[in-house]
Amino acid sequence: MRQRLLSLDMLRGLSIFGMVFSAIIPSGVLPPWMYHIQNPPPTHNLDMAQAGITWVDMVFPIFIFCMGVAIPLSGRVKIAAGKSAKEYFKELFTRFFMLWGFAYLCVLLNMSSCGGALAQLLTLAGFCALFPLYLQSSKGRTIKWPLRAAGILLCLLLIFIGERLYGFNISLGRRSIIIFLLAFLYLFGGAIWYLTRERLNLRALIFALLLLFTLVTQYLELPATTYANPNIRWWFNMEEFYFLLLLLPATYVGDLLSSSKAPAEAHAEAHAEVPVQAPIQAPAETAAQTKGGKGALRVLLEGALSLIILLFCTWTLYFLYKIYRPDFNAALSRESLISLNLLINCALLPLMGIGTARLWPRFKGVFAIAALFLLWGLLMDPLDNGIKKVPCTISYCFVSFGISALLLIALNFVAQIKANPLQRIFAGAGTNPLMSYVAYYILLLPILKLTGTMTWLQGITASPLAGVARAALLVLISMWIVSLFSQKRIFWRA
């Protein structure tokens, strides 16, 4: 049976939960920290001048981080299995185009917003049509190309029906921007990693050039120029390069974890995808399996360290949210508070690093690079005139990377606890990310509408708080459904 790094699966599952959950919570009535900070309630109009981040602004970077970590984990297994450079790049481009297509299909096949039972049935048919396109067996063999071609024809037929019946606009601009960006990031990140897999100095040079490119293009305000041109923005976005500042360090994390695998794990089967599952095992003997007082003390220490890291990440997010609030008022200036927070971080991070090195030696290097980029990002914050998602700032990429890596370490303890329902749901959904991303919209929601359950749920959860609970429950149900597919070794892979 294949060995896995459950903390990476769980982190990916959490990011998917966050993306879907934040998209379906009640709009305009919740506190500002429940939304993108630049889309505040009640109107949610984009305010590019607003700096700061909330937890919602973190879910996509975490997704990118998981993808970056997984690229070396799967790539090194493929290389060890004898794949040539030609085969690697052929697979890389195939997956890029399949992901690019998925960015359009997951939007164009979703007719659940239309009224009537037929629209819901067509949406469910769209979910089924994605199987011949993206289904992969547990042994990594993709569906034969004739069946994949049939899936393409079925998807095109459903899109044509939707356009005729409901007047859907079919254009190059109608796609999921998240999957669209991930496709390009996977292409660039996968290529850069392969070419620099044994030459970290070259990867560092590419990273430095990307950093310079980001500084220059943002100074010249090129992101706004390219996005304003509809002939360019459907295929090109500056963030395709900016987010590499997050993804490339994540590939180094993947290299660190890959090099720490046990010999038996080096032959793990690779059918990883974007976002990929990671063929890597948690420690063979978990803390919870040890016996005696020493084992119990270790469990207590690991649990305490995991909690401290989670609280530290929470504080960092709260700090970067609070100091940029319009109603922020404190005795010290914002710059003074940022400096004070940096000093506190410089004191706390080494202590947490010592604990990580003692309890989880495998993650020693991961913690070091996480701390480095987190501090670097906080230092860049004032230089960027505040951390921002739009336009994507350097501090946003670096802080997001640091928090993502720390969360991966903290979840290592959670993943070692004896399997529980929530762990199975998040890890199961995390191993099947493409399906998880669309399961609520084109599987669960149409069923709820067909049966009248959605109308009933909306009636009994009219208050904002109840609406949040409803959103969380429905996303968990959709992820649970996907986890059942994963347990049956039914995966969607580009």
Enumerate the language-model features and the residues they cover.
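Alpha-helical transmembrane segments and their immediate juxtamembrane cytosolic regions
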Residues: 1-267, 285-494
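Long, intrinsically disordered low-complexity tandem-repeat segments
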Residues: 266-286
